[in-house]
Amino acid sequence: MNKTLKKLSRRVALSIAVTACFSPLAQAAELLTEGVFKVGMEVTYPPFESYDSNNNIVCIDPEFAALIAEHLKAKPQLIDTKFTSLILGIGKKYDAVISGMYVTPERQKQADAIPYALSGASIIALKNSTIQPKTEDELCGVKVGLQAGTAWVSSLKTHSDEYCLKNGKPAISIQEFPTAPEASQALLSKNINAQLEIAPAAQIIVEKSRGRLAISSNRLVYPLPLGIYVAKGNTELAEAIKSTLATLKANGKYDAIIKKYNLESIN
């Protein structure tokens, strides 16, 4: 009887070991270089990522990156990269991109995305301006600034063509800037009339403007899921990240980050 139990125990132990070797986390960890989970992000985009007073990268995405790395039994390495170049560096400079980046069909042609939160844009205007757009319909004829490469560029162009022009209204004047802070500066300098920015970041921009800017929109504009991007076909890493997010939702750490930064959870 004891011999039978010992044999059964060995088989169970072997089965567990084999299963562990072929789990998404184990397979993904093997793909990482020297046990490092490299993540690309543009570190001028609070509250998604920014430098603190000690030059550490902090905020939403670094917190998610650290938790994913922990589950992969790896060390996180955050690589500051220009927003418009982020997708191009996946699989070359870093393993994934976590940078407040929406999931869009255009980006999904270049990389695979794992949704991790939901957000939308806010419209920012000069507080004392007569131009206070509440919705995208009120952007017709308005000079709107936003960061180049964001999902809203094509959305605004489509809205300008299919709503503004078709209804006899002037087109939306879309002004693209290399970074969100440059768009904000253009607004403060009155070179544009409004800025379109993701809601959590828009709130911080307004708070730092010393009362000069305000959020004029009365609801989220173009709400979309935010995604963690990995190289196309890297199913092991994608599944490992999905598994990690499921664990974080189960243990409450996911909800803690979502609530802390005023995002919406996604199933």
Q: What is each of the regions a protein language model found here?
A:
Residues V43, L118-S122, E207-A246, Y261-N267:
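Periplasmic-binding protein-like
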Residues T84-L88, M101-K109, S155-H159, L188-S189, ...:
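A ligand-binding cleft/hinge motif common to bilobed small-molecule-binding domains
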Residues A29-G100, E176, N251, K260:
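Extracytoplasmic small-molecule ligand-binding "clamshell" domains
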Residues E63-H71, S129, D137-A151, G227-S265:
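Extended ligand-binding regions for polar small-molecule ligands
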Residues A66, E70, K75-E138, R219-L220:
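Acidic, polar ligand-binding/catalytic clefts
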